[in-house]
């Protein structure tokens, strides 16, 4: 699922990508992958790294792109003794765009629709 957010008076969802906006991608499918790599020219290696469930927090660069990988909490419904686990989220930036990619559906980015 792909969402385009533009900063006006808070984050406003747009129907299509605009320069200087934020593209939030959750559980990317083939269309999302193609959009990111072909339309936005995001390095494919960045998306592969984010897909690795064991990926550790770090930064990397390729060309004018910066990748920051963080780990965010997700509810663990399979083990009640360990209520939360963490999964990687990638924040990919260049001079015109911010892209966040997470291969898991989490609530961590769902608060972006709030007005600041």
Question: What is each of the regions a protein language model found here?
Answer:
Residues 1-110:
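Divalent-cation
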Residues 112-116:
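Conserved small/polar residues in nucleotide/adenosyl-binding loops
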């Amino acid at each position: 699922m792909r969402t385009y957010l533009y900063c006006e008076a808070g984050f406003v969802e747009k129907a299509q990508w605009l320069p200087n906006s934020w593209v939030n991608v959750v559980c990317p499918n083939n269309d999302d992958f193609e959009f990111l790599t072909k339309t936005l020219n995001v390095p494919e290696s960045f998306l592969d790294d984010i897909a690795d469930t064991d990926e550790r927090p770090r930064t990397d660069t390729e060309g004018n792109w910066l990748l920051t990988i963080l780990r965010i909490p997700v509810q663990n419904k399979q083990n009640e003794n360990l209520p939360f686990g963490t999964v990687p989220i990638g924040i990919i930036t260049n001079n015109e765009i911010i892209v966040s990619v997470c291969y898991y559906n989490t609530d961590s980015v769902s608060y972006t629709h709030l007005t600041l």
